[in-house]
C-alpha cells in the first residue's frame, strides 16, 4: 500500500495510485458522478517496446480529491480474438464516457485504428448501467462514412443533445507509393437520443493543408457561453504546440485564436498532449487540462523550435531547417519499437483566462485549494 497521500498535483512526475502502482489512464478524462471523481483512460501497463500489445483495455480510478486515485479495475476489457476490433494489438485510443439521463446508461465511445491499415479508423460504442461496471460493446463501425480520428464528446446542459468532435482522416499516397494519414478538418456531428450513434448530419471546421499542419486530438469545453476546442498537431507521440479555437455555437464558424502554453519555450505544450478538459464542479472558474507526457526520455537539449523544423521538412515551399539525419536522430524515440508508453507520465495543469482566451502556464506543483 502506498502510504503517501498526495495533497497537490505534480505535473510531469510519476503518479502512483493508492496501491503504489503507476496510474494507467492514458488519453484520459475525468467525470464527476455519484459523489466521486472518476478518471479513466487507456491501460498501457503491458505496452512495452517490442510487444504486440497496444492496449490492455480501459482502466477506471476513483477519488475524493483528484489527487489520490483508487484502482477500480478494467471497465472495458481487451479481446484475445485476433479478428476482434478491440484485440489488444489494435490501436485503441482515447475513450470518452457520457451519461444519458433518459436511458440511465453510461455510454463509452472509443477510437480504433486498424493495425492493418491505420487510415481505416472506426468508433467502438459500449454501454454500462454503472460507471464501475464492465462496459459491453454494442457497435464497432465507421461513422458518417468517414475515417474518424481522435475525438471528444460533449452534452448540452439544457437540451441534453450530445455532440462528437473528431478529426477527419484521409488516405494520402506519398511519392514513395506508401500511404499515410492526412488530417484536414475537425468534424462536428450530433448524436442520437441514446448517445449510441450519430444522427447522420455533420459540419466541417478548421480546415488545414494536412501533414504536420493538420490538427487532431480535439478537447472541448465551455465557459461563459463560448465553446472552445484545444487541438494538437499531427506528430505522433512527439509533443507539439496546442492551439485553441473558439465559437459561439457547436457547429458555427470556429476561429483559431492561437497557442495556449504561453511560457513554453520548447513549443511542445510542456512536452505533453491534452486529451480532455475537466471543469471542477465546486470551483467558480477552475478548468483542468488533462494531458499525457507520452515520451519521458526526450533529450535535455531538445531544440526549442523542433516543431517548426518538422514542418519545414513537410513543406516544399519552405527552406528545411535541419538535415534529415539530425531530425531522424531526434525522432528515434518516437518509433514504435522504442516507445514505452507504460511509463508515460501526466501533465495536469490549470487553465487561466486572459479575457476570453485560455492560457496555460507551467506549475511544478499546484493545489485545487488555491482556487475559489
Roles of regions detected by a PLM:
Residues 1-372:
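Carbohydrate-active catalytic/glycan-binding domains of CAZyme proteins
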Amino acid at each position: 500500500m502506498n502510504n503517501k497521500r498526495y495533497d497537490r498535483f505534480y505535473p510531469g512526475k510519476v503518479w502512483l495510485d493508492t496501491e503504489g502502482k503507476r496510474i494507467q489512464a492514458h488519453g484520459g478524462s475525468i467525470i464527476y458522478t455519484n459523489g466521486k471523481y472518476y478518471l479513466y483512460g487507456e491501460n498501457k501497463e503491458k505496452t512495452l517496446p517490442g510487444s504486440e500489445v497496444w492496449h490492455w483495455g480501459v482502466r477506471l480510478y476513483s477519488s475524493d480529491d483528484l489527487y489520490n486515485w483508487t484502482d477500480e479495475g478494467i471497465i472495458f476489457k481487451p479481446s484475445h480474438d485476433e479478428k476482434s476490433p478491440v484485440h489488444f494489438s489494435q490501436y485503441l485510443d482515447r475513450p470518452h464516457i457520457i451519461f444519458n439521463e433518459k436511458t440511465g446508461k453510461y455510454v463509452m465511445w472509443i477510437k480504433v485504428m486498424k493495425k492493418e491499415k491505420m487510415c481505416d479508423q472506426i468508433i467502438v460504442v459500449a454501454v454500462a448501467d454503472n460507471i464501475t461496471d464492465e462496459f459491453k460493446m454494442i457497435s464497432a463501425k465507421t461513422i458518417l462514412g468517414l475515417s474518424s480520428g481522435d475525438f471528444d464528446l460533449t452534452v448540452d446542459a439544457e437540451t441534453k443533445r450530445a455532440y462528437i468532435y473528431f478529426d477527419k482522416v484521409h488516405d494520402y499516397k506519398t511519392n514513395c507509393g506508401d500511404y499515410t494519414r492526412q488530417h484536414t478538418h475537425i468534424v462536428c456531428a450530433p448524436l442520437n437520443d441514446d448517445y449510441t450513434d450519430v444522427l447522420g448530419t455533420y459540419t466541417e471546421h478548421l480546415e488545414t493543408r494536412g501533414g504536420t499542419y493538420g490538427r487532431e486530438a480535439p478537447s472541448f469545453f465551455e465557459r461563459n457561453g463560448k465553446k472552445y476546442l484545444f487541438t494538437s498537431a499531427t506528430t505522433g507521440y512527439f509533443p507539439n504546440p496546442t492551439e485553441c479555437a473558439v465559437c459561439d455555437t457547436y457547429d458555427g464558424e470556429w476561429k483559431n485564436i492561437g497557442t495556449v502554453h504561453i511560457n513554453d519555450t520548447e513549443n511542445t505544450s510542456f512536452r505533453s498532449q491534452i486529451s480532455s478538459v475537466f471543469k471542477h464542479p465546486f470551483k467558480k472558474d477552475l478548468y483542468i487540462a488533462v494531458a499525457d507526457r507520452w515520451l519521458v526520455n526526450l533529450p535535455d537539449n531538445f531544440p526549442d523550435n523542433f516543431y517548426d523544423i518538422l514542418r519545414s521538412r513537410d513543406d516544399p515551399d519552405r527552406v528545411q531547417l535541419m538535415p534529415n539525419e539530425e531530425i531522424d536522430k531526434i525522432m528515434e524515440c518516437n518509433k514504435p519499437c522504442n516507445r514505452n508508453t507504460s511509463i508515460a507520465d501526466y501533465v495536469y495543469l490549470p487553465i487561466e483566462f486572459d479575457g476570453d482566451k485560455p492560457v496555460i502556464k507551467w506549475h511544478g506543483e499546484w493545489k485545487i485549494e488555491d482556487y475559489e
